[in-house]
Amino acid sequence: MIYAGILAGGTGTRMGISNLPKQFLELGDRPILIHTIEKFVLEPSIEKIVVGVHGDWVSHAEDLVDKYLPLYKERIIITKGGADRNTSIKKIIEAIDAYRPLTPEDIVVTHDSVRPFITLRMIQDNIQLAQNHDAVDTVVEAVDTIVESTNGQFITDIPNRAHLYQGQTPQTFRCKDFMDLYGSLSDEEKEIWTDACKIFVIKGKDVALAKGEYSNLKITTVTDLKIAKSMIEKD
């Protein structure tokens, strides 16, 4: 089976324009989270869309699904997320297992709730690549020069931009593989390796690159929200 895992566990309100976490802010005529879920609803091969949210916001997320996606709510599971990204993925996979016991071939397409401009093509590319690889990471080519500094004051390296990509989401992999790899980490490693695909890479697994889009914006600041609103208005 193929599942989607939407990471919506953040509680940050640092935009300073609302008491709502950013995934619940309005973008056009509906919340950011709803825009994101809608993109996954369009892919018929996805059995369930599991949304991991902070425990304080589970009821709110369920109410939004009832209001904006009543025809699809049977395909959507709202579950309590974890304290960080990878524990949220773990909670999402546990919710999948509760729905239907996991098999070795079950795949989860994980995605940031605050990237509402994901395309169906990106979702389908992730699913296709995951059939033949251990994991898939969605990326775009680095446009700006990337500068490395180990102390925040002086440049220590300027890597060759031709070899660099900017990571986005989705990130896709088999549910059991993630659970096994994550479970093998020490507590210290879990704190350091916060990116799921990095765990696969460090453990020597095959991680394929899927082509992202520069429009696959992650809305984390007021400026991002302004850009997103402009993009919605143009559509």
From Swiss-Prot:
It holds the Pfam family IspD. The keyword Transferase applies. Pathway: Cell wall biogenesis; poly(ribitol phosphate) teichoic acid biosynthesis. Keywords: Cell wall biogenesis/degradation, Nucleotidyltransferase, Teichoic acid biosynthesis, Transferase. GO terms for biological process: cell wall organization; isoprenoid biosynthetic process; poly(ribitol phosphate) teichoic acid biosynthetic process. CDD domains: CDP-ME_synthetase. This is Ribitol-5-phosphate cytidylyltransferase. It comes from Streptococcus pneumoniae (strain CGSP14). The record marks 14, 22 as: Transition state stabilizer. The gene is tarI. Catalyzes the transfer of the cytidylyl group of CTP to D-ribitol 5-phosphate.
